[in-house]
Amino acid sequence: MKIVLAYSGGLDTSIILKWLKETYRAEVIAFTADIGQGEEVEEAREKALRTGASKAIALDLKEEFVRDFVFPMMRAGAVYEGYYLLGTSIARPLIAKHLVRIAEEEGAEAIAHGATGKGNDQVRFELTAYALKPDIKVIAPWREWSFQGRKEMIAYAEAHGIPVPVTQEKPYSMDANLLHISYEGGVLEDPWAEPPKGMFRMTQDPEEAPDAPEYVEVEFFEGDPVAVNGERLSPAALLQRLNEIGGRHGVGRVDIVENRFVGMKSRGVYETPGGTILYHARRAVESLTLDREVLHQRDMLSPKYAELVYYGFWYAPEREALQAYFDHVARSVTGVARLKLYKGNVYVVGRKAPKSLYRQDLVSFDEAGGYDQKDAEGFIKIQALRLRVRALVEREGHGA
């Protein structure tokens, strides 16, 4: 049997690699995706080979990640439950897509992942896998093995020659990519406890951020960001640049309790500096270029799209149908937003667009601009008709 494993290089997936070989008598191919997590991917590849993988594949997927997954999601204005910009959720279908592709190319019968049986990631990986290859076998060791805790896993690692880090384990789990870093579990499981001050990696503590604000301009073309401060950049380079700018000003920290797809609530702490800047910049340009009813309709549909991404339905027909709508709407989003960053805050201070629907002559108190204020009286009376009828009916009812 041949299995392709999503391999991070950490202790858990190294244990899984050995466990798969023993339990399934299988040849294991390790696949590591570089999506900007900041870890040495080549080291992970070499470690996989030392741990027993027959082959180790490492791919730089940063550009594909941002171009084909993050930017389409951003065109939809997707935010889960009002705060979460979906940094972990959007990475899983990309990883699973390549797991399936490699399995097909290598003639593997199964894929495997290291997601636990309590979280969302198991669903995201597997929904993608089954959507792309309905007959694929998916192995989820956390749902199968008998380890009762961390001590048993470490004992297994030591018995099988898997290096165990000598540094003290972090009191929380962490997942990173080019869009964000997430922190969960451990000391964060108490929703009343403030996150440890030294936990954050992408962002400066807002209290210690520079005392002078920094201005940044983001240019959009047909829905996607293309330049920062006048410099055109590739999708991954643009997001990285905004991460650096936003990070030094403490932008993009979020601490929430969210509803997992599997039914439980969990606390997540996130850093999304570049994504937060892009969210505000996009809305600033949209305020000029989108028709009122289109904007309102888009905002009604965005939460459903965000839910689909969060749950793992990236390759579902309903997500693809919504994407076609959002892509059509985004074609008019061309312009520039100017933002001021200061101690964790993002302030929109300017916006412009070549096809702006904002007409200064219409809103000016000094110019008529073709708008006859007398017309407002009839407009108001028509809008008030149903309200007046309701009031009259209620009054007659009371009189009876």
UniProtKB/Swiss-Prot annotation:
GO terms for biological process: argininosuccinate metabolic process; L-arginine biosynthetic process; urea cycle. Keywords: Amino-acid biosynthesis, Arginine biosynthesis, ATP-binding, Cytoplasm, Ligase, Nucleotide-binding. One of its GO terms (molecular function) is argininosuccinate synthase activity. It is found in: Cytoplasm. Pathway: Amino-acid biosynthesis; L-arginine biosynthesis; L-arginine from L-ornithine and carbamoyl phosphate: step 2/3. L-citrulline binds at Y84, S89, N120, R124, S173, S182, E258, Y270. It catalyses: L-citrulline + L-aspartate + ATP = 2-(N(omega)-L-arginino)succinate + AMP + diphosphate + H(+). ATP binds at A6, Y7, S8, G9, G10, L11, D12, T13, S14, A33, G114. Homotetramer. Belongs to the argininosuccinate synthase family. Type 1 subfamily. This is Argininosuccinate synthase. It comes from Thermus thermophilus (strain ATCC 27634 / DSM 579 / HB8). The lineage of its organism: Bacteria, Thermotogati, Deinococcota, Deinococci, Thermales.
